């Protein structure tokens, strides 16, 4: 006799893994069904996590008790903090990961969660009675009953892959599509659309001439995504490489347009604007003589490289001929060609802010089936769907993040209220309150909420309280401690900053743009001693304190705007009651 579950999650990608983990950790008996248990949270496209705004999302998932950041740190091969030259609202962590280790670590996580069962199979039908989902049926003829179901099917629903005029059914190279669900949902009034994404060829690193490429190393000091302290610092010892296309490459690519599924009308789905194929780029930006390409390593124990910026669905011979004209790739061999994939999605205006559907009760959607693109966006939706499915079962208030609380709140609000007409990707520009939604304070914004939900254990909540206490002590010291001209002027002159003529509070010095706490501590012994007393994460705590000191005026002003808007929304809401 098969058990009945509280929550069934369909699909083991980034959304599905976070959804299943959240539901089970909140105490719900949960089943995760996936077609291939060796590919949990598979990095189907580039082997990287984070990036502009996306890195903030990963840190928010971590702050709420999800696992994407922890798994990223364990599989990391390179770390970079993007946009360091800009203000802290724009800083975004990004990591290259070992694709195989990433999947393996996710499986370890899932197998250690007590109330989570795993099942390898393909869901072909939802069990729906009187407008409420009651479970699922699988290809093996198994029926699982549940109180709630979360669909996280990614690109697999009626997936079709293209290389030139050749087309193959599938949701990913070598994997079958999921069929039957869209047809069933259409009968219940759901609108179904088609979207397109793509991936580039994978290169054999043994055939790349790296001497002709520009090396791009990770940050000297490294870094991590999770707010937890790890036993070992994440690795940061693999480089990426940069090269460029040129007009001859573009000419070769153009010879394949007559065979391109994009230009022959075979593919009707809309592709991601911010991750266009190489054929899209040379048409849209015909005035550009070159396009930048990044060669990203797939892992520690492989020669495979991902060529970021060269996504294509052109015929294989055209792809290969064009690749061989790129500097450094004259003798390149490939492991497989690039391809486009077209798949079903459901316009997310058919959902509530909890990610529960409006047409079928207790059914939730998360990830690319909502019209988003990216591992990070998918993971965030999965986490929120997992949380809200459990709260629905308990008949407790829904968990909805506001736009001034998290990028996750911006993401879901955009999807539900605006919908999508192309694959949705998060950017810092989408957030009105990005000074509040920084990557450094995701734990301060969200970890207490995760603790209340039961996702963040007490020891982790204690870490947050320690961080806030040490940060506030550091800020108070800087506000009250005075420095004399003889003590600090040698440092100021070296830093190109105006010397003091009389004693000043340390705060006045730290506020100068050319001065940082880490630099000045070497010249102010009591400050250095205070920082050295901070156990473990002192770099993170110093950064948090410095951001608050330097940007306090901007932060306070933005918080006032957010609070004012909330009051207006409350008044409007009451007026409509």
Each language-model region and where it sits:
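Internal hydrophobic alpha-helix adjacent to the cofactor/substrate pocket in enzyme cavities
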Residues: 378-399
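Extended, charge-enriched "interface" segments that sit outside catalytic cores
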Residues: 430, 436, 447-452, 456-574
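A glycine-rich dinucleotide-binding beta-alpha-beta segment and adjacent secondary-structure elements
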Residues: 306-372, 400-413, 538-574
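Conserved beta-strand-loop-beta-strand element in the redox core of flavoprotein oxidoreductases
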Residues: 127-143
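Core beta-strand elements of the Rossmann-like FAD/NAD(P) dinucleotide-binding domain
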Residues: 3-5, 139-148
């Amino acid at each position: 006799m098969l058990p009945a579950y509280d929550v069934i999650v369909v699909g083991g990608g980034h959304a599905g893994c976070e959804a299943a983990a959240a539901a089970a950790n909140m105490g719900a008996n949960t089943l995760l069904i996936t077609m291939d248990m060796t590919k949990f949270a598979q990095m189907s496209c580039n082997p990287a996590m984070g990036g502009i705004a996306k890195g903030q999302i990963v840190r928010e998932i971590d702050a709420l008790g999800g696992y994407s950041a922890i798994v990223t740190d364990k599989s990391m091969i390179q770390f970079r903090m993007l946009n360091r030259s800009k203000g802290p609202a724009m800083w975004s962590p990004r990591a290259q990961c070992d694709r195989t280790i990433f999947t393996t670590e996710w499986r370890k996580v899932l197998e250690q969660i007590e109330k989570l069962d795993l099942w390898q199979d393909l869901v072909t039908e939802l069990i729906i009675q009187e407008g409420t989902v009651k479970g699922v049926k699988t290809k093996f003829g198994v029926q699982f009953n549940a109180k709630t179901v979360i669909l996280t099917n990614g690109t697999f629903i009626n997936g079709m892959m293209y290389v030139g005029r050749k087309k193959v059914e599938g949701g990913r190279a070598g994997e079958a599509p999921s069929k039957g669900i869209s047809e069933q949902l259409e009968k219940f009034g759901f609108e179904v659309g088609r979207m397109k994404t793509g991936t580039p060829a994978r290169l054999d690193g043994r055939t790349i001439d790296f001497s002709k490429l520009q090396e791009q190393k990770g940050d000297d000091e490294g870094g991590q995504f999770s707010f937890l302290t790890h036993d070992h610092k994440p690795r940061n010892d693999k480089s990426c490489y940069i090269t460029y296309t040129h007009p001859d490459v573009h000419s070769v690519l153009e010879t394949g347009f007559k065979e391109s599924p994009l230009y022959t009308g075979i593919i009707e789905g809309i592709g991601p604007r911010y991750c266009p194929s190489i054929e899209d780029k040379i048409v849209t930006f015909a005035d550009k003589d070159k396009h930048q390409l990044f060669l990203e390593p797939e892992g520690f124990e492989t020669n495979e490289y991902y060529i970021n910026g060269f996504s294509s669905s052109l015929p294989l011979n055209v792809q290969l001929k064009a690749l061989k004209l790129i500097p450094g790739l004259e003798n390149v061999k490939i492991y497989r060609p690039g391809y486009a994939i077209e798949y079903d999605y459901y316009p997310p205006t058919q959902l509530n802010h909890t990610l529960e559907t409006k047409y079928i009760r207790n059914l939730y959607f998360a990830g690319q089936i909502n019209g988003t693109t990216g591992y990070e966006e998918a993971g965030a939706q999965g986490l929120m769907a997992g949380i809200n499915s459990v709260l629905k079962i308990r008949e407790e208030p829904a968990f909805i993040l506001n736009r001034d609380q998290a990028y996750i709140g911006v993401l879901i609000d955009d999807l539900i209220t605006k919908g999508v007409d192309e694959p949705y990707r998060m950017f810092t520009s989408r957030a009105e309150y990005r000074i509040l939604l920084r990557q450094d304070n995701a734990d301060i914004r969200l970890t207490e909420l995760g603790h209340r939900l039961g996702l963040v254990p007490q020891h982790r909540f204690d870490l947050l309280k320690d961080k806030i206490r040490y940060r506030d002590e550091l800020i108070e010291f800087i506000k009250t401690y005075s420095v004399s001209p003889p003590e600090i002027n040698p440092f100021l002159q070296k830093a190109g900053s105006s010397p003091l003529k009389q004693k000043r509070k340390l705060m006045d010095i730290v506020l100068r743009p050319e001065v940082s706490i880490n630099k000045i501590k070497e010249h102010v012994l009591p400050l250095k001693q205070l920082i050295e007393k901070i156990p473990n994460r002192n770099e993170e705590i110093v950064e948090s304190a410095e951001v608050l000191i330097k940007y306090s005026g901007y932060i306070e002003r933005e918080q006032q705007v957010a609070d004012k808007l909330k009051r207006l929304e409350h008044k409007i809401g009451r007026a409509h009651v």
